Amino acid sequence: MLGSVIARPLAERGFQVLIQSTRGTFGSGGVFDPFRFEREDGLATLEWVVKQPWFGAAIVLAGGSYLGYVQWAVADSLPPEVKAIIPQVTESALTLEFLRKDGLTLETPFSWGVMVAGQERRGALLRGMAQVRRNRRALSTLPLGQADVAAIGHHSDYVQDVLAYDADQPRWAGIDHRHRVAQVSVPVCSIGGWYDIFLPGQLRDFLILQEAGRPARLMVGPWTHISADGTALRESIEFGLAHARGEQPPPRPPVRLYVMGEEAWRDFDSWPPGGYLPQRFHLQPDGALASQPPGESASDRYRYDPADPTPAVGGVRMGRGSGRVDNTALEARPDVLTYTTAPLEEDVEVIGEVSAEIWFRSSLPHADVFARLCDVDPRGRSRNVCDGLVSLSGADELICAAVRLWPTAYRFKRGHRIRVQVSSGAFPRYARNPGTGVPHATATRLLPADQEVYHDGAHPSAVILPVRQAQ
């Protein structure tokens, strides 16, 4: 499959393409331990390649997801024959993105762990859709530590490790290559998507390169993890071929972003671009959203029931139905609050990091807050722009929940409205909060919670957007 999807387009343009199986997979010796041996094996592979009689004097490393991560694993020790690297939809500390302290990402690591556990079985690709349905059912298993058994009949070591070990525990030592990023000595072309799971880490890596003065380009398109189009391929080939030949790609500013809403590519000198200032849009009574601070008002309430969890709709997911989608049905649920501006009198352009501060109280000490930014068109259709979740302890006391949403580049057009959703979950993208404080892997009880969102002068809940008024 990789041969036809990745190798053929590159080979047709003059590259010799080498795709390597990870240790312990598809006939490769040793034991498969995801992410563990990629530095050791990657450096050994590069040493072998340059000694081959067919080697043509220049190497470009390219690939997405895991195939991008392995580039960062060797980035600070590249032989001189490597002329450029092109990591796509990836970052230098891959698994750690799933283990963020602000909320356990569930669906992606579970699906990937289940997939690699059976990837060498006969007919694995043909059984893919049936496996997706089994995974969906399995993710509701209690305790969650048995979900992989429900999906594939046995435990997945990777899934068990994700459920059992926090990001700072020794199990993950050696798979974090963030410290290598600033030491890369060759040009980098980093390609990502606004709805990709690894985008925050990918932008962090680019910032490191930028601050270290390394030669680097960034392209971010309107893509999910698996939906990049020919634009990304053309960028890779143009950049890779030029450096392989000892030339420079056509000059342009280092950052190229697809601005959604405007539906156009724009070039910038840096990430985040200059000239965008944080603007607070405050939650108001009666579901309003406005730039002025709120006055006195009562809190809004909803009940979150993990036995009927608020579903993940679109957004940062791996499979079908991800990305920008219609949120009408989601917003009709009683466990989702919405706050919406009046129709905009002029375009509002948002590019950069997005966050929210939600004053919140739950009937239980353990709760989650999910915030989503949406664009509502003149027909009333609400489509998601970016979102994020934070898990709270001590939530039975009034607390300001700081939610880090995904970065974005979006133009809200005149006549449209800006909307913020507030809820307590996006299952199965994020693990549902059982409300008991028991670890996800072992929790067997699910407690419903009554939630309150405050928006008054003393508790000014808001979404903070990096805004430049469009001319």
Regions found by a protein language model. Give the residues of each.
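Glycine/threonine-rich phosphate-binding loop and adjacent beta-strand/alpha-helix elements that clamp
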Residues: E211, A232-R234, E247-Q471
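Accessory cap/linker subdomain of secreted extracellular hydrolases
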Residues: L2-I6, E12, A73-Q183
